[in-house]
Amino acid sequence: MRVLGIETSCDETGVAIYDTEAGLLANQLYSQVKLHADYGGVVPELASRDHVRKTVPLIQAALREAGLQADDIDGVAYTAGPGLVGALLVGATVGRSLAFAWEVPAVPVHHMEGHLLAPMLEDNPPAFPFVALLVSGGHTQLISVTGIGEYRLLGESVDDAAGEAFDKTAKLLGLDYPGGPMLSKMAQAGDSQRFTFPRPMTDRPGLDFSFSGLKTFAANTIRSNGDDDQTRADIARAFEDAVVDTLAIKCRRALDDTGFKRLVMAGGVSANRTLRQRLGEVMAKRGGEVFYARPEFCTDNGAMIAYAGSVRLLHGASQTLGVSVRPRWPLADLPAV
């Protein structure tokens, strides 16, 4: 089965073609970072309009990359949520329209299920069961995963997601949008001993997160210590260490609670090298394994949507002609297959 995947949940337009026998055949991506940079964040209306301009050309490019024609596609998968409602509607409308025209089934895909399953695209995919750390600009969640659609929420952020905290703190440090990756690069030159940031909610039981206080702590530290280059690097290092330590502590607790030996990390922040190294050390000490996707599949992309859609379509999932999206959509609401 060859599935066309369309991702338009936020500020990346992603299109990919996944073959259940041959693997990934095409992957096209357009980022709107430059479009939104002057505003310091994503402007929903601008995002939607840009998806309108880019989605169909990217579909054409994906077909060319794969050497396929429209009648070679067996199904269409599109992100139906969570995300920006206008942006979601673009991908959903295009996906449903193509499925109707091509007379193939279409399936709505949960954006975070796409992230969760992205490591399945790698040569050494994780086996069930596992604990998943979904960590991005919009979500920070720990999930017990025992099968496709068998998801149990263990803990989540009660305020800012980790990726959001990275971007907001980067802005305080004078970095351009999106600042998270630049903050991590700056942190490499920082002194880990100069500042100590708190590890929020690690002093009590539970698996929930809170990152908004770290942003406030960073702002106060900047005001008290100036903003020369070395001080900014030291603050970036202290902030990143605090986030990574907090995530690692909560992952250990989740693994203890479930008894699982495998950890999957997914979402944009899972590309962070410091986080990968730390969780690799955690799992090595436990005699377990950690899995993650290659960096280009950590951020939003069409490949993860095409793959997740192929799994659902193989088990008979499809949707009627109606186009519906869900800006808010709990992962636990998905049916098992």
Curated annotation (Swiss-Prot):
EC number per UniProt? 2.3.1.234
Name of encoding gene: tsaD
Annotated keywords: Acyltransferase, Cytoplasm, Iron, Metal-binding, Transferase, tRNA processing
Task: Give this protein's Gene Ontology molecular function annotations.
Answer: iron ion binding; N(6)-L-threonylcarbamoyladenine synthase activity
- GO terms for CC? cytoplasm
Q: Which residues form the signal peptide?
A: none
Q: Where in the cell is it found?
A: Cytoplasm
Q: What class of enzyme is it?
A: transferase
Pfam families hit by this protein: TsaD
Recorded protein name is tRNA N6-adenosine threonylcarbamoyltransferase
Residues binding Fe cation are 111, 115, 300
Cofactor list: Fe(2+)
Q: Where does substrate bind?
A: 134-138, 167, 180, 272
Organism listed in the record: Pectobacterium atrosepticum (strain SCRI 1043 / ATCC BAA-672) (Erwinia carotovora subsp. atroseptica)
Against InterPro entries, the record matches this protein to: ATPase_NBD, Gcp-like_dom, KAE1/TsaD, TsaD
Q: Name the family the entry cites.
A: Belongs to the KAE1 / TsaD family.
> What's noted on cofactor binding?
Binds 1 Fe(2+) ion per subunit.
The lineage's top-level taxon is Bacteria
Q: Does the keyword Nucleotide-binding apply?
A: no
GO biological processes: tRNA threonylcarbamoyladenosine modification
Q: Which reaction does it catalyse?
A: L-threonylcarbamoyladenylate + adenosine(37) in tRNA = N(6)-L-threonylcarbamoyladenosine(37) in tRNA + AMP + H(+)
Q: What does this protein do?
A: Required for the formation of a threonylcarbamoyl group on adenosine at position 37 (t(6)A37) in tRNAs that read codons beginning with adenine. Is involved in the transfer of the threonylcarbamoyl moiety of threonylcarbamoyl-AMP (TC-AMP) to the N6 group of A37, together with TsaE and TsaB. TsaD likely plays a direct catalytic role in this reaction.
